[in-house]
A protein has these predicted regions:
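Non-catalytic pre-domain segments flanking phosphatase-related domains
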Residues: 1-16, 35, 42
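Mg2+-dependent phosphoryl-transfer enzymes with acidic/Ser/Thr/Gly-rich catalytic loops
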Residues: 4-13, 30, 206-291
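Conserved ATPase-coupling elements of RecA-like P-loop NTPase cores
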Residues: 25-29
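Active-site phosphate-binding/coordination module
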Residues: 31-139
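Short active-site oxyanion
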Residues: 44-48, 69-71, 172, 231-232, ...
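Short, structured coil segments at secondary-structure junctions
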Residues: 67-69, 77, 193-194, 248-249, ...
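Conserved acidic, metal-coordinating active-site core of Asp-based
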Residues: 108, 112-115, 119-236
Length: 291
């Protein structure tokens, strides 16, 4: 069995979740964190995101600090692998929902009173009842002010759901539920449909993906494009959609603010939460320290 030092010395590729990990409490990257990312890349490490967000939606989050990763990123919780923050750029990998199961799931989510948004290429759909104050609309407005590209954000109306979706691919569905009854009903639906799986990512949020898609599979694809293996990857995460990649990576780090299922599988835990530069401080300690 490898020692911790041996695991650290074997790492060539560092991938970080964004919300709750790389991002601060305001869901933005601090200048200090961006600087650590650049130092790692300057030192020869590959650095990228492994996020539940769609890759094309990251532009307004990366642009203010001029941060550009030097390796393929994992987006939509594993549903896509490609260049982070680039609308219209070629994807190295995508895995979309089967069409009929997608429609059934969206209709069921609405029928129990929950809301959703979808990640795909070209458009982001948000259920009508969720309103226009969700982070997708907020980030879209920020992107417009900055003059950078962002997918079109569209409110999806129940009666025209199928027509509005058109033939566009959907990689991931983020679901907001108000209570345990809604959550349990949606999990029961997922269990009855073998082509879809899901997990909780926060107290009132969950994600649904095509079966076989998760961040671990995405990390493996991104690593292989660089001629590396998951054993040469260090990953950081904080919530349910990070568990698979933490189990698969050579070195796994949970945030201090992580959920219990993440803390249970990680090799290391940061000394500080995401609101106090926890990921950046741990990266400095592991890979940039002179000790």
């Amino acid at each position: 069995m490898q020692t911790l030092r041996e695991k650290i010395e074997n790492i060539r590729f560092i991938l970080l979740d964004m919300d709750g990990t790389m991002f601060n409490a305001a869901h933005r990257i601090d200048a200090e964190t961006a600087d650590v990312m650049r130092q790692l890349m300057d030192k020869g490490y590959y650095v990228a995101a492994a996020t539940g967000r769609g890759l094309a939606t990251l532009q307004p989050l990366l642009n203010p600090l001029g941060l550009r990763f030097n390796a393929p990123s994992v987006g939509s919780a594993g549903g896509e692998v490609g260049e982070a923050g680039c609308v219209g750029s070629e994807r190295l990998f995508t895995h979309a929902f089967p069409r009929e199961e997608l429609l059934q799931l969206l209709r069921f989510v609405l029928s129990v009173g929950a809301n959703f948004c979808t990640d795909g290429i070209g458009r982001v759909f948000v259920s009508e009842a969720a309103g226009t104050d969700t982070y997708q609309f907020k980030d879209s407005r920020i992107a417009k002010e900055m003059g950078c590209a962002y997918p079109e954000v569209v409110q999806l109306h129940t009666e025209t759901l199928e027509q509005q979706l058109g033939e566009g691919e959907v990689f991931k569905i983020l679901i907001w539920h108000e209570n345990d009854a809604q959550r349990d009903a949606i999990f029961d639906f997922l269990e009855a449909h073998p082509g879809i799986h899901g997990f909780s990512t926060a107290r009132t949020m969950m994600e649904a993906l095509p079966t076989g898609v998760d961040k671990a599979a995405g990390v493996q694809i991104a690593a292989e494009k660089l001629g590396l293996t998951p054993a040469q990857c260090c990953v950081f995460g904080d919530s349910g959609n990070d568990v698979a990649m933490l189990k698969a990576a050579g070195l796994s780090v949970a945030m201090q603010n992580a959920s219990d299922d993440v803390l249970a599988v990680a090799d290391l835990v940061t000394d500080y939460p995401n609101s106090e530069f926890g990921a950046a401080r741990m990266l400095q300690k592991l890979f940039l320290s002179e000790e």
